[in-house]
Amino acid sequence: MGEVDEAFVQALEHRPKLSVTEAEGIPLIDLSALSATNTSIKNPDSTIRDLVVEIGNACKNWGFFQVINHGVPTDKRRSIENMARKFFEQPLEEKRKVRRDEKKVVGYYDTEHTKNVRDWKEVFDFVVESPCLMPTSPDPEDKEIAETYNQWPDYPPEFREACEEYAKEVEKLAYKLMELIALSLGLPPDSFNGFFKDQTTFVRLNHYPPCPAPHLALGVGRHKDAGALTVLAQDDVGGLEVKRKSDGEWVRVKPTPDAYIINVGDIIQVWSNDAYESVEHRVMVNSEKERFSIPFFFFPSHYTMVKPLDELTNEQNPAKYRAYSWGKFLTTRKGSNFKKLEVENVQIYHFRVQELADKLDGALSINNK
């Protein structure tokens, strides 16, 4: 990655501004109430109810928030961060021994694309439940399901254990957050839990090397997360930028020591029938410092049909999306990581009911001519 190949260069309108706007107002939420012995999400007292209001406001107004006193042990986080550094320090040929491809969809990768532009990063992915069941193709008629197994490197020797122990702890946090989000929508706290049986969740270790042209390239181009929830650990270098809902400005999320950055994904947007919105974000790189981050992508089972929840729709607020297969959606997305597409990748707005109505109107007007 010494030279900036044109594959990394963003279109003019998407190139990063090197002057940084620090985000004012991204909520910082203290979860210590969850660990108090006399409180429970199942029977919320006033402190939990206050927390639920905070979470709901953050989801509605930002789609992003940070959490502290979250219950994930610091030593587990430090351990996986150290393992990531050791793994990425190795020569390329060593890392490529666990390279992922279109058949092995987890492992090491260094040529990922976001919106058809190559990202300035290298990654290592592992699934939280192994084997993980996934459709073999995005074709709706193809019912074949494959088992995905993790590929673990020989070095560092403690790598697998550190990854698995960390994932268990963050998974507990993800479930708690989903329960708080359910309450904030007026639902029972366990409303979402069933979707995550046979989950397709994965964890990614990101390494962003120093970039000689940070004004041209991005660590990750602008995108929205396709899953339900993302729980992100970032180091003190920073670089994550969020598109502020109020004015569309790109703002930098300043690292808070030991905090996690949480963002609502597309699935929550659909489940909530647009009450909460998945927000665009991107990652800046810099010319001097490398950066590491570890996102936990909380994904439901492959057989989940994602649609607005019945409890959140009625005659006055009809469903804004038709149901779609999460497994087929994810398989389509995964395939696009390996090649440039001639058309736009699948997005949730392709399933908007209004989009469907517009297409039908268009077809009718053509047929009537």
Regions found by a protein language model. Name each.
Residues 1-369:
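Peripheral, non-catalytic segments flanking oxidoreductase cores
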